[in-house]
């Protein structure tokens, strides 16, 4: 089955993570706890309601070697593509070990697998740092800003600047394009309308 035909949603990510935890526990027992930190599209899915799916699950994986087998077995059982849950993100410019420190607790499965996520201004900082002008990266930034506004916990430019500095050492680590994009949308403030324009465009 090719990855084009697999869509990960909040519900099925939960199911697959539960199965991975069970499989991992079967292999290594209770004494070897593991941790996954969801990033990218998967982190958007579990923290926010504006996005329906992603095509793979990116994570930082802290676990015994049995985790790889557990992931592959669950993938085989559900007909998921190789690499459906992967740590390839570690090879990108957006990776920094500081993501561990800023991640927030999400859920524990089978008393052995703790799942954390990167959210709010830190997820925005990662999206901006990747510098990709992909529709989904730009719409994710706007969706996160819009949803925090609706929740009554708006994210400020100062918080975003601090997050970029915490993770990547300074504002100038962002491309000129990313700096201009976030400055313009924060000045504009109509996050929902801008989100709709990008998604429809």
Which residues does each predicted region cover?
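Compositionally biased terminal segments of proteins
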Residues: 1-201
């Amino acid at each position: 089955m090719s990855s084009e035909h697999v869509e990960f949603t909040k519900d099925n990510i939960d199911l697959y993570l539960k199965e991975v935890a069970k499989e991992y526990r079967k292999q290594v027992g209770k004494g070897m706890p593991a941790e996954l930190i969801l990033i990218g599209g998967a982190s958007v899915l579990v923290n926010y309601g504006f996005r329906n799916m992603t095509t793979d699950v990116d994570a930082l994986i802290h676990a015994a070697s049995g985790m790889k087998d557990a992931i592959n077995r669950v993938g085989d059982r559900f007909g998921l593509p190789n690499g459906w849950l992967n740590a390839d993100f570690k090879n990108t410019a957006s990776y920094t070990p500081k993501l561990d420190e800023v991640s927030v607790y999400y859920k524990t499965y089978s008393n052995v697998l703790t799942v954390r996520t990167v959210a709010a201004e830190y997820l925005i900082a990662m999206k901006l740092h990747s510098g990709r002008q992909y529709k989904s990266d730009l719409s994710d930034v706007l969706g996160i800003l819009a949803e925090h506004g609706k929740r009554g916990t708006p994210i400020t430019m100062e918080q975003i600047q601090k997050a970029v500095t915490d993770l990547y050492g300074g504002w100038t680590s962002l491309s000129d394009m990313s700096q201009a994009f976030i400055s313009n949308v924060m000045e504009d403030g109509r996050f929902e309308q801008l989100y709709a324009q990008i998604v429809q465009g």
